[in-house]
C-alpha cells in the first residue's frame, strides 16, 4: 500500500507542474492575464477531471486485481482524484497569484507546487482512509 500512496503523490506533482508550466508560459507570452483567472482555472479543472477519471479507473482496477479489496481501491483512487484536482488548481492559482503580487511567477513552479501537493495528498489519503475504513479498523 505504501507504493500506491507514492504513486498518488508523484501524479499530483506532475499534474501541478504541467499546469503551472502552461500558466507561466501564458503569462510570459501575455496570452493570460490575472483577470483571466476563472477561465484558466476552469480549463485546468476540466483537464484534471478527465485525467483523474482515466487514471482512477485504471488504478481502481489494478488495485482490485492485485489486492482483491474494493474498499482500499476506492480510498486510493479517491485520493488520487482529489490530489490531481488540487494539484491542477494550485498549478493554475499560484503563478497567477504571484503575478498579482508582482512576483516572478516562475517561483511558483514545480518545487513549491510539488511540496504542497505532497503534503495535501498525504493528509487526504490518511483522513480519507480513516474515515472510510474506520469500521474495519476496530
What role is predicted for each listed range?
Residues 2-6:
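Short, small-residue-biased leader/transition segments that mark boundaries at the very start
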Residues 126-138:
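Juxtamembrane boundary at the C-terminal end of a transmembrane helix
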Residues 57-67:
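Short membrane-interface helical motifs at transmembrane helix boundaries
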Residues 14, 26-30, 52, 64, ...:
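Conserved, well-folded catalytic cores of nucleic-acid-processing
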Residues 70-71:
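Hydrophobic packing and interface segments
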Residues 37-49:
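Interfacial transmembrane-helix starts/ends
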Residues 15-40, 90-113, 138:
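Juxtamembrane helix-loop transition segments at the membrane interface in multi-pass membrane proteins
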Amino acid at each position: 500500500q505504501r507504493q500506491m500512496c507514492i504513486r498518488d503523490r508523484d501524479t499530483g506533482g506532475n499534474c501541478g507542474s504541467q499546469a503551472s508550466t502552461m500558466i507561466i508560459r501564458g503569462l510570459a507570452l501575455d496570452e493570460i492575464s490575472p483577470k483571466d483567472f476563472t477561465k484558466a482555472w476552469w480549463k485546468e479543472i476540466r483537464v484534471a477531471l478527465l485525467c483523474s477519471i482515466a487514471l482512477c479507473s485504471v488504478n481502481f482496477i489494478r488495485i482490485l486485481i492485485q489486492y482483491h479489496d474494493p474498499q482500499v481501491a476506492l480510498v486510493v483512487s479517491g485520493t488520487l482524484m482529489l490530489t490531481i484536482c488540487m494539484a491542477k488548481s494550485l498549478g493554475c492559482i499560484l503563478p497567477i497569484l504571484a503575478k498579482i503580487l508582482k512576483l516572478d511567477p516562475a517561483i511558483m513552479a514545480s518545487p513549491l507546487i510539488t511540496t504542497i501537493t505532497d503534503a495535501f495528498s498525504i493528509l487526504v489519503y490518511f483522513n480519507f482512509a480513516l474515515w472510510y475504513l474506520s469500521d474495519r479498523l476496530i
